[in-house]
């Protein structure tokens, strides 16, 4: 892949994701497209094969945080296939480079370029970092770009009922935010000066070649482009301070233990006008003394008497947060049989509910009254000729 292709190809468009997509979103988009265009699923389809290669190439760049950062930086500098510094560069001339010539090493600047010749280098140079024009006046620099805020992860513990029905819970978080004392400037008086080392760009050259240099964050201003004359006592001149806040978070119905919920734009505030990061809420769910959960279904174990199991009847069953339901118990119901109360389970994403799975547990009495004992004794005598274990022994012999 040539450097020209690297710069000009929009890999975000290839995968169909926004430029601020998370690693998880990029991975999900890649897997979906890779399945659809895989050569094994499209035998003889040349277009699908080319598309698969393009998708894999995009994932190789965007799926690697380091490569993605360098790709974004390179596109920001050579965005539309041409590099056009402002009039402050060198003698004030405008430079128009064709990417094909530029990365071939034969680009020449227009009038007033101030002694800059062509430069060599290919994809390896781009992966090394941003290119920055050397020579000329302060106008050659570009001010530090807006920076997206960091993502935050927090945890919340819900009761079993809250997880099933949904709940709004208070969430207290601590993060770095623009310092209120100095309005994020880092200067006590709110009037920082432009860093003389980087001339406000936030970057300094770390080596040159062919008239261009690779850049690093300025060590004097820490990449901010500004220096506090009188550092703020609260943030020590950084412009950022620890901030605590409490917000009400709506947890949707039907969440499960360990589920991660993403709230866009609720993370750390961005810098220099950049967007805020995201908030990820990890949900923990307490156990319920009666009910359990199996996917969208709830479970409950209901004890029944021997007579109810043998003769059949109606059994009342509790539900979560609602009135009880009555289930008809067929005669001869064995211990451990599961019955279903439809629509009494957990809430699904489409608003419908799963079922309540009711497991029958035959209760054996520990203390029998005289009449009950006599009745069971009579039952034993009446069924003395029956052997419930006969089939068991027969099967054991035949195995």
UniProtKB/Swiss-Prot annotation:
Record's keyword annotation contains Disulfide bond: no
Gene Ontology CC entries for this record: cytoplasm
PROSITE patterns: DNAJ_1, DNAJ_2, ZF_CR
Species this chain originates from: Streptomyces coelicolor (strain ATCC BAA-471 / A3(2) / M145)
CXXCXGXG motif repeat copies, ranges: 179-186, 195-202, 218-225, 232-239
Pfam families: DnaJ, DnaJ_C, DnaJ_CXXCXGXG
Gene that produces this protein: dnaJ1
Example GO biological process: protein refolding
Function: Participates actively in the response to hyperosmotic and heat shock by preventing the aggregation of stress-denatured proteins and by disaggregating proteins, also in an autonomous, DnaK-independent fashion. Unfolded proteins bind initially to DnaJ; upon interaction with the DnaJ-bound protein, DnaK hydrolyzes its bound ATP, resulting in the formation of a stable complex. GrpE releases ADP from DnaK; ATP binding to DnaK triggers the release of the substrate protein, thus completing the reaction cycle.
CDD domains per the UniProt record, alphabetical: DnaJ, DnaJ_C, DnaJ_zf
This protein's domain notes: The J domain is necessary and sufficient to stimulate DnaK ATPase activity. Zinc center 1 plays an important role in the autonomous, DnaK-independent chaperone activity of DnaJ. Zinc center 2 is essential for interaction with DnaK and for DnaJ activity.
Zinc finger (CR-type): 166-244
Protein name: Chaperone protein DnaJ 1
Cofactor: Zn(2+)
SMART domains hit by this protein: DnaJ
